[in-house]
A protein has these predicted regions:
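Juxtamembrane helix-boundary/capping and inter-helix hinge elements in multi-pass membrane proteins
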Residues: 2-9, 44, 101-106, 114-117, ...
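Signature of multi-pass transmembrane helix bundles
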Residues: 8, 16-188
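Membrane-interface alpha-helices at helix entry/exit sites of multi-pass transporters
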Residues: 9-16, 124, 220-232, 263, ...
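Membrane-water interface of transmembrane alpha-helices in multipass transporters/channels
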Residues: 11, 147-155, 182-192, 258-267, ...
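Transmembrane helix-bundle signature of multi-pass membrane transporters/permeases
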Residues: 17-22, 93, 114, 157, ...
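Hydrophobic transmembrane alpha-helical segments of multi-pass transport and channel proteins
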Residues: 22-26, 30, 161-166, 198-203, ...
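Helix-loop-helix junctions within the multi-pass membrane cores of secondary transporters/permeases
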Residues: 194-276, 330
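Residue-level detector of conserved catalytic or cofactor/ligand-binding positions
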Residues: 331-339
Length: 339
C-alpha cells in the first residue's frame, strides 16, 4: 500500500481488487458444486458399518433465514456454538473498524495479529503430526467402508481437478480477454513459470516475489499496483481452495446420505467465500477452514479424514490456480488504473 502512495488510488485499487476476488471465489464455489453434483463422486459408498450416532445434521432452513442468520446477534454465543457465518462477518466488521481507526487501535490490532500468528503456528505444529493421524483415520475408515471407497475418492479428485481447470482456463481467461483483450494463450505461456513454481511449493506466499517480477518484466504490469495486489491476493484470493471445499461438501454429504437443499448450497457459497478472506497462503491451509464449511450446513466433519490423505497433490494444483487468479485480477486492475 505504501508503494501506491496516493490514498485515493489505494482505496480504489483495494475495493476493485477485493470485489474481484470475492466475485471469482463465489464463481469458483459455484463451479465446484455444479461439477460435483454432475459427477456425484460420493454416490455408491455404503457406510452401514460406520457409526453415525455422533453425527448431527442441521435442520434445513429457508434461504431468507440463512441470509438473516449471517448478521451476528450475539458474537459470544456464535463463538460458543461454532456458528461460523456470524463469526466471520463479525470478524470482518471488527477488522474494518480497526483499519479505519488506524494508530489509535494499534494495540488491539497488534494483539489480534499476533494471536492469529500464534494460532497458525500452533495449527502448523499440529499439522506436522497429521500424517500419522490421517493414516489411522484412513485405516479405520477403510476397515469400516472397505477398499471400494478408492473409486469414489478418485472421482472426488477428478471433480476437483476438472473444476480447477474450468476456473483457470475458462473463467479466468474469459475475464482476461473480455476486459483486457490480452491473448489468453500468450498470458499463460508467459506466466507458466510462476504457475509451475506455485505447483511445486504449494504456497502462495512463496510465489509473491516471482509473480511481481514476472508480471512486471513479461506482461508490463506496474509494480506500484502489483506490490499491493499480489500480497493481498495471497491472503484473500483462495479460489482453488474454495473449489476443493465445494466438491468436498457434496462428496461427504453424498457418502452420509445427506441431501443439501438450494439454501444449503447458497450457504456453502457464502461460507467458503468469506472463509477465504484472511486465510494464510501456506500448504493445506484449506483443510483448516473446511471444517467450518461443513459445519455451516450440518455435514459431518468426520468425512474430512477421507480426503486428507490425497489433499497434498490437490493442494499443489489449487495453489497454481490461486496465483493465476491473482495475476488475472492484477491485469484487469492495471488496465482500469494506469500508472
Amino acid at each position: 500500500s505504501m508503494a501506491i502512495g496516493d490514498t485515493k488510488t489505494l482505496g480504489k485499487v483495494g475495493i476493485k481488487t477485493i470485489l474481484f476476488y470475492l466475485l471469482t471465489t463465489a464463481v469458483a464455489v459455484s463451479v465446484a458444486l455444479s461439477v460435483a453434483m454432475l459427477i456425484n463422486p460420493g454416490i455408491g459408498v455404503t457406510i452401514e458399518n460406520v457409526s453415525t450416532s455422533s453425527v448431527t445434521i442441521t435442520e434445513k432452513q429457508p434461504l431468507t433465514q440463512t441470509l438473516l442468520n449471517i448478521i451476528p446477534k450475539n458474537p459470544v454465543e456464535s463463538l460458543a456454538t461454532a456458528d461460523m457465518l456470524p463469526i466471520i462477518v463479525f470478524a470482518l466488521f471488527v477488522g474494518i473498524l480497526l483499519a479505519k481507526m488506524g494508530n489509535k487501535a494499534s494495540t488491539v490490532a497488534n494483539f489480534f495479529s499476533q494471536f492469529n500468528d500464534l494460532m497458525m503456528e500452533m495449527t502448523m505444529a499440529v499439522m506436522k503430526a497429521a500424517p500419522i493421524g490421517v493414516f489411522c483415520l484412513i485405516a479405520r475408515t477403510f476397515a469400516n467402508i472397505g477398499f471400494d471407497a478408492f473409486v469414489p475418492m478418485l472421482k472426488y479428485m477428478g471433480c476437483v481437478i476438472l473444476a480447477l481447470a474450468i476456473q483457470c482456463f475458462v473463467v479466468y481467461q474469459l475475464l482476461l480477454f473480455l476486459f483486457t483483450r490480452l491473448n489468453p494463450f500468450k498470458f499463460l505461456k508467459k506466466f507458466f513459470p510462476v504457475m509451475n513454481f506455485a505447483f511445486t511449493t504449494a504456497t502462495s506466499n512463496a510465489t509473491i516475489p516471482l509473480s511481481i517480477n514476472t508480471l512486471d518484466k513479461k506482461l508490463g504490469v506496474s509494480k506500484k499496483i502489483s506490490s499491493f495486489t499480489i500480497p493481498l491476493g495471497a491472503t484473500v484470493n483462495m479460489d482453488g481452495t474454495s473449489i476443493m471445499q465445494g466438491v468436498a461438501v457434496i462428496f461427504v454429504a453424498q457418502i452420509f446420505g445427506i441431501t443439501l437443499s438450494p439454501s444449503d448450497l447458497v450457504t456453502v457459497i457464502i461460507t467458503a467465500t468469506l472463509a477465504s478472506i484472511g486465510t494464510s497462503g501456506v500448504p493445506s491451509v484449506g483443510l483448516i477452514t473446511l471444517a467450518m464449511v461443513f459445519q455451516s450446513v450440518g455435514v459431518p466433519t468426520e468425512g474430512i479424514a477421507l480426503i486428507m490423505g490425497i489433499d497434498r497433490i490437490l493442494d499443489m494444483l489449487r495453489t497454481a490456480v490461486n496465483i493465476t487468479g491473482d495475476a488475472v485480477c492484477l491485469s484487469l486492475i492495471h488496465i482500469s488504473e494506469p500508472t
